[in-house]
Amino acid sequence: MQCSTPIPPGYAFCGVCGTPRSRSESAAQAPEPAREAGALALIDDLGNESVRYPLQAGENRLGRGHDCEIAFASDGLLAGVHCVLSAAEQPFRLRPLDMHNGTYLRISTPVELHHGDIIRVGQEVLRFERIEELQAETSPVTGRKLTVGCAMPRGVWGRVCQIGMGRQVANAYLLSHRDVFLGRERGDILFPKDGFVSGSHAVISERGGRVYLKDLGSSNGTFLRVKREITLRNSDLLLLGRNLLRVHVGAA
């Protein structure tokens, strides 16, 4: 016989008479599953999507830490919390947190370069510098600026520094042509030993005092380090440590 004792949430039967909870009541008590706002797809060595990571409708932490919503525990190039992707609403927003190895976005159209911007071409990490913004060294004794080395050649408007181990400058390339080409086989700045760099990979151009970076249809793409919060579009490609991820906006 069914009594009128209310059944507490989470219980399947009445503790007094043993009557089971009705299906309609059970359905009303069931928590709603977390809404999937989109996903990140890991790109494998063949360029195919492999693992798919759902994005919750809110903030999603990415990094090496186990408390991240999307964790890559074995990637030593990532910080505990490397960046945060907000999928609360469209467009999605990405906020970088790591100050060492950085978060990169693959460029699909020409982008303007600014002093200090970091570029990834293949395995190469390159820092762009404007000549007029380079600071001369300062004497530790007098505090005055020092002029080190030879005077800068006429017509030079920029410099690209190749960053090596320990974040030290391995090579420096002066930019004086309006278009400076980067590649493995053809161009002004070559990386012949980097198999991830295309024969002709990218170009840095100076136009009217402004500088632009353009990918030349390379196989593996050209990436620019994200310095501040940005918006993301569907199919954008992110590079975090050793992980290449494609953004999918909206539930599958």
Give the residues covered by each predicted segment:
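Intrinsically disordered, low-complexity acidic Ser/Thr-rich regulatory segments
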Residues: 1-74, 86-88, 112-188, 252
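A short, polar/proline- and glycine-enriched secondary-structure boundary/capping micro-motif
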Residues: 103-107, 131-133, 138-140, 222-226, ...
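Forkhead-associated
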Residues: 53-121, 172-242
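Edge beta-strand at a domain terminus
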Residues: 127, 244-249
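Short coil/turn segments at secondary-structure boundaries
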Residues: 194, 251-252
